[in-house]
């Protein structure tokens, strides 16, 4: 299962991508996270339904300096060939 999410709020310049990286790796998820030009952060993660539910809930928390206003999330079954979890540009 794949989770695709766009996170809105104060999520750039506050360590959000590195925090997502740590959360994803701690859960054993594969995928990526990146900053977008519009000030959002985009995430794509692969895992079980339960893992992705927990991960999505964690996205609402974010690191201490962040403020998450919205998480736009969708799920799909299209297989990916992710190699671990990484920050992309």
Descriptions of predicted regions:
Residues 1-89:
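Intrinsically disordered, low-complexity, mixed-charge
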């Amino acid at each position: 299962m794949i989770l695709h999410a766009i996170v809105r709020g104060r999520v750039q310049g506050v360590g959000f991508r590195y925090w997502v990286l740590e959360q994803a790796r701690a859960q054993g998820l594969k995928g990526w996270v990146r900053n977008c030009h519009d000030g959002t952060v985009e995430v794509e993660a692969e895992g079980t339904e339960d893992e992705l539910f927990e991960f999505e809930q964690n996205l609402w928390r974010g690191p201490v300096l962040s403020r998450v206003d919205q998480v736009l999330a969708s799920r799909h079954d299209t297989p990916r060939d992710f190699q671990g979890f990484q920050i992309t540009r």
